[in-house]
Amino acid sequence: METAQQLDKPALDTNDAARDKAINEQVTMTQDTPYPDQTVGNPFVDDPKMRLRDVEVFYDDNQAIHGVSLDIGKNEVVSLIGPSGCGKSTFLRCLNRMNDTIDICKVKGSLHLESQDLYDPKLDVVELRARVGMVFQKPNPFPKSIYDNVAYGPRIHGLANKKYDLDEIVETSLRKAGLWEEVKDRLHAPGTGLSGGQQQRLCIARTIAVSPEVVLMDEPCSALDPIATAKIEELISELSESYTIAIVTHSMQQAARVSSRTAYFHLGRLVEMNDTETVFTKPEHDLTEAYITGRFG
């Protein structure tokens, strides 16, 4: 369980030249190519795990997300793609209320995890974040041992009555994260002493240790080398057998490799969502095609 101080904050820095350039390119594109009246493709599924309708996000008076509606299916891997500043990470953080940590942020719309209203005032947000876990862009292991990083959540949520039970949860989580064989003989070593790729897999183990239903990943490989990235991508495929996964990525190649459906965001709007192969080989909207062919972004 991450504290507010340990969370990566959304990119709100207007001095970020690359981000500003990407936003300006998006504005220029929409001057020539208007948004569709509604999202192109197939953003909805039967019997969704998460049902999201007319989602809007504001930072004070600045609207970051404009009326996004989509479904995420059970045990589906969905990729959210788009240029810097398009709102994909902001949208992802709505799904387990990480945006609550930002005082000026306000979320509107209907967001449900099956029948549960995610923004019900009576909802225990800590419990929600156990059901909908998050893996961040930069690995953020706690300053604790490898064992205690994974055991932290189960202890907080009372998932283990005995040390034997806790040991089993830790081992199972590390195995699912593909890390057990690498750390089983040094479980009490600091988690911060692992390599970057190992740290990210430790964070994934920490997330799944509380048995979430959904795992959100915000650019989980952006700070990793190609070998570590390949391990995370293989892990995503394996985890999808047990969990529903939504991943934000700047890498279109990664989206193509790991996801069954892909959603393209542009200046806070969902332009197109469809099965991944269709989005990348036969995009239906000109803005999507312009992005995936490298004309901007």
From Swiss-Prot:
Catalytic activity: phosphate(out) + ATP + H2O = ADP + 2 phosphate(in) + H(+)
SUPFAM superfamilies: P-loop containing nucleoside triphosphate hydrolases
Keyword line: ATP-binding, Cell inner membrane, Cell membrane, Membrane, Nucleotide-binding, Phosphate transport, Translocase, Transport
GO biological process: phosphate ion transmembrane transport
Compartments in which it is found: Cell inner membrane
Binding site residues for ATP: G82, P83, S84, G85, C86, G87, K88, S89
Record's keyword annotation contains Translocase: yes
Membrane topology: Peripheral membrane protein
Gene Ontology molecular-function annotations: ATP binding; ATP hydrolysis activity; ATPase-coupled phosphate ion transmembrane transporter activity
Primary localisation category: membrane
Any one GO cellular component localisation term in the record: plasma membrane
CDD domains in the cross-refs: ABC_PstB_phosphate_transporter
EC number, UniProt record: 7.3.2.1
Pfam families: ABC_tran
Family note: Belongs to the ABC transporter superfamily. Phosphate importer (TC 3.A.1.7) family.
Subunit architecture: The complex is composed of two ATP-binding proteins (PstB), two transmembrane proteins (PstC and PstA) and a solute-binding protein (PstS).
Name of the molecule in the record: Phosphate import ATP-binding protein PstB
Species in which this protein is naturally found: Alcanivorax borkumensis (strain ATCC 700651 / DSM 11573 / NCIMB 13689 / SK2)
